[in-house]
């Protein structure tokens, strides 16, 4: 109500001295979000990828191509070629039954060999367990090691989704999930030290994260002084599948889960259905998504904002009220607003709010501004990016506390950038900025 009264009072006075010169309106520009590229347009779920000597290799859960389909490419973006079955003989005949060979992970060993960990159907129990195989080429053939699974806690529902992690000090581990979902129990993501090129276990199990829901497909990354544990959640069979993460200063925890998931169908504006099974490789992330009943493979650029991940094309939210304010103020208890606070009274010639945002690579992005406009006509803010005028943001009428979005194209540098909204036409409150 107070915001409406302010607008009415200013309109009644009609004194030019009370109003700043309006920003010259600029046409709303076409959205420039760059979404992950589809690089394998057929079933290729639960991907694992790495680069060696200028060639990229990728592996997937079993499909019509074989037990462990393998593909290669000259770059992460392709073109990708399916090369066949990396484990043509199938999983270990001593304990596994072919048909459910899931979530492969291949690691290039220092001695020039390669180790594959895989999930397979445990014949004796009907559960899934983790096996290991080795090869002298990334294309295979991988030959199973031993007549028993490497990890198989049947009392916990079995084990799936092993992924190799090598710490900065050279210590090698597997991160994996006990499949509690298969027996109606909670699931935990575990960390286990390995030896002999990852073919044997060398220590006990450390519990990382536990969930009564679905938590799977772990991928552990060390950035600076912190660890990031990526995982998938939600049902993998539809667009509700997602990728999130947790951080910790040490492998023993405590782990803090991100406030919002990193990648969802919604954060990609439905350009990917159920982004999950993520594999982070430096400044790239490989992820699968549903297309006409199959899970296709995508790749996206990743930036690391103070060692936190930013995926190009996936929306990242910055609360406007956490930015730098000049001659405007934060309004608390804003009904329906993100985090309950907004920036108000950007009403004067020297009023502005500025937020720092992170871009994984240099290029075009879409800036979505959450706003409410009760002025009675279209309002605007001037748009200044890294100190340079990039036009304006227009805000159609919504009414106060009715939060909507207005989107414009911006050009950003790789790394941190500043986005400043300045006084324009009429009056608008700003809830948040989302960069995509």
Predicted segments with their positions:
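Carbohydrate-active catalytic/glycan-binding domains of CAZyme proteins
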Residues: 28-329, 366-370
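Secretory targeting and sorting signals
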Residues: 1-27
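Intrinsically disordered, low-complexity regions enriched in Ser/Pro/Gly/Gln/His and often acidic
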Residues: 10, 14-15, 20, 49, ...
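Extracytoplasmic
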Residues: 312-436
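Low-complexity, intrinsically disordered short peptide segments enriched in small/polar/basic residues
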Residues: 4, 20, 31, 36-37, ...
């Amino acid at each position: 109500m107070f915001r409406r009264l302010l607008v009415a009072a200013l309109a009644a006075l009609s004194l030019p001295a009370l109003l700043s010169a309006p920003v010259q309106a600029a046409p709303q520009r076409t959205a420039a979000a760059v979404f992950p590229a589809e690089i394998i347009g057929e079933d290729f779920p639960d991907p694992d990828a790495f680069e060696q000597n200028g060639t990229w290799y990728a592996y997937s859960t079993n499909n019509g191509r074989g037990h462990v389909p393998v593909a290669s490419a000259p770059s992460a973006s392709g073109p990708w070629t399916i090369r066949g079955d990396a484990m043509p003989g199938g999983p270990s005949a001593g304990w596994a039954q072919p048909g459910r060979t899931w979530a492969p992970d291949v690691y290039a060993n220092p001695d020039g060999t390669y180790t594959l960990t895989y999930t397979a159907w445990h014949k004796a129990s009907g559960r899934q367990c983790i096996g290991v195989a080795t090869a002298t080429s990334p294309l295979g053939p991988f030959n199973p090691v031993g007549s028993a699974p490497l990890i198989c806690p049947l009392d916990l529902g079995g084990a799936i989704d092993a992924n190799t992690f090598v710490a900065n000090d050279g210590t090698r581990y597997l991160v994996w999930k006990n499949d509690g979902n298969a027996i109606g129990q909670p699931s935990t993501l575990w960390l286990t030290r390995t030896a002999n090129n990852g073919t044997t276990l060398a220590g006990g199990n450390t519990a990382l994260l536990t969930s009564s829901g679905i938590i799977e497909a772990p991928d552990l990354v060390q950035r600076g002084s912190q660890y990031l544990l990526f995982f998938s959640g939600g049902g993998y069979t539809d667009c509700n599948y997602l990728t999130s993460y947790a951080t910790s200063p040490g492998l023993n925890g405590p782990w803090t889960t991100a406030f919002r998931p990193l990648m969802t169908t919604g954060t990609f504006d439905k350009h990917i259905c159920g982004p999950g099974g993520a594999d982070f490789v430096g400044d790239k992330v490989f992820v699968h998504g549903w297309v006409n009943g199959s899970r296709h493979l995508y790749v996206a650029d990743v930036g690391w904002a103070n060692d936190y991940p930013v995926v190009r094309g996936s929306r990242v939210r910055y609360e406007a009220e956490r930015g730098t304010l000049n001659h405007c103020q934060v309004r608390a208890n804003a009904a329906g607003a993100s985090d309950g606070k907004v920036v108000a009274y950007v009403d004067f010639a020297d009023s502005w709010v500025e937020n720092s945002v992170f871009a994984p690579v240099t290029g075009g992005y879409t800036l979505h501004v959450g706003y409410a406009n009760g002025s009675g006509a279209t309002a605007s803010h001037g748009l200044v990016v890294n100190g340079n005028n990039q036009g304006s943001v227009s805000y159609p009428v919504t009414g106060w506390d009715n939060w909507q979005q207005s989107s414009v194209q911006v050009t950003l540098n790789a790394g941190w950038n500043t986005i400043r909204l300045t006084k324009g036409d009429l009056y608008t409150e700003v809830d948040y900025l989302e960069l995509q």
